[in-house]
A protein has these predicted regions:
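An acidic- and aromatic-residue-enriched active-site/binding cleft used to recognize and process polar
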Residues: 1, 191-193, 219
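RNase H-like, metal-dependent nuclease domains and their acidic two-metal-ion catalytic environment used
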Residues: 32-215, 250-282
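Acidic, glycine-rich loop-and-beta core segments that form the ion-binding/anion-interacting portion
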Residues: 1-54
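Intrinsic-disorder/low-complexity loop/linker signature
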Residues: 5, 152, 244-245
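Short alpha-helix plus adjacent loop in nuclease-associated cores
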Residues: 213-257
Length: 282
């Protein structure tokens, strides 16, 4: 049952409206024989809040807050250790946790928060990868993200970006970062280049004598949907921890560009304005 009947403007089925009038609680399942309450909670966690509202509550009138589902406030921002992490990281939107010293380029009222508490023993990460988005046909930017995982939490150590396609200098610099963070797997998007980038990486991996597996992925879903479907469930559950240095690096990038174009290249500016509309990503 809907938490707010206003968006439906009298379009609810009479049976549903009657159930609501008789005391059905918001969020309860309308067909318990098909979906249990626990099943719906699991689906909302897996799909993300905005997609769940669209698919399971048929709400097409998303507010601005729901239209842009990737919020900086859902991140946990702290100094990320290169090799170890605690068992659990607690998020809380208490005003005392707002990081007022970090620059924000998100929507009004959207701030970064530090963790409420770090719990448990500090041990090594379960896995560390480097995700590489190569430039398209060698004409635009290449980006690399260094990410570790432990107990279902993702830790973003560092972002790197390059404007010289996939030159030797770029690939070698990415591999230097792999050595710094003990990366075991390179995840490479192969939409452009037809595997050329992977072959170039293999050559440099052999030369640098690093033990890194290469995992090629090919995206066949529109970029905006792919980004939101991947990130929203993680952000809703507050399981992405970002190093402070990533935010500072992002804000200070492209200093020589005009202010309006600088913003368009910023990671967190793009993230906060990401929606399912085509062209949301420039």
């Amino acid at each position: 049952f809907p938490k707010d009947s206003t968006p439906y403007e009298g379009l609810l089925a009479p049976q549903l409206q009657e159930d609501i009038d008789n005391g059905a609680s918001a969020g309860d399942c309308t067909d318990p024989d098909r979906f249990s309450d626990e099943d719906l909670l699991q689906r909302e966690a897996a799909m993300g809040r905005s997609n769940f509202m669209l698919q399971f509550q048929l709400d097409t009138t998303l507010s601005d807050a729901e239209k842009f589902p990737l919020k900086m406030a859902d991140l946990i921002v702290t100094s990320v250790n290169p090799t170890k992490a605690p068992d659990n990281v607690i998020w809380c939107s208490d005003p005392r946790n707002v990081l007022k010293d970090l620059p924000t380029v998100g929507l009004p009222g959207d701030y970064f928060y530090s963790p409420m508490q770090l719990q448990g023993e500090w041990t090594e990460y379960d896995e560390t990868i480097c995700s590489v988005d190569p430039s398209g046909r060698g004409t635009d930017e290449t980006a690399a993200a260094y990410i570790s995982q432990k107990n279902g939490f993702l830790y973003l150590h560092e972002m790197r970006a390059y404007r010289d396609g996939y030159s030797d200098n770029t690939l070698l610099d990415i591999l230097k970062g792999c050595k710094k963070y003990n990366v075991t797997t390179l995840v490479i998007e192969t939409n452009f280049g037809d595997g050329i980038v992977s072959e170039l990486f293999k050559k440099h991996i052999q030369q640098t004598k690093q033990q890194i597996l290469i995992d090629e992925v090919r995206a066949n879903v529109r970029k905006e949907d792919r980004i939101i479907d991947s990130l929203e469930p993680i952000l809703n559950q507050h399981r992405l921890i970002v190093d402070r240095g990533v935010i500072e690096w992002d804000y200070s990038s492209n200093k020589d560009s005009a202010p309006e174009s600088r913003l368009l290249y910023m990671l967190f500016y793009q993230m906060s304005r990401m929606c399912r509309q085509k062209g949301a990503v420039k």
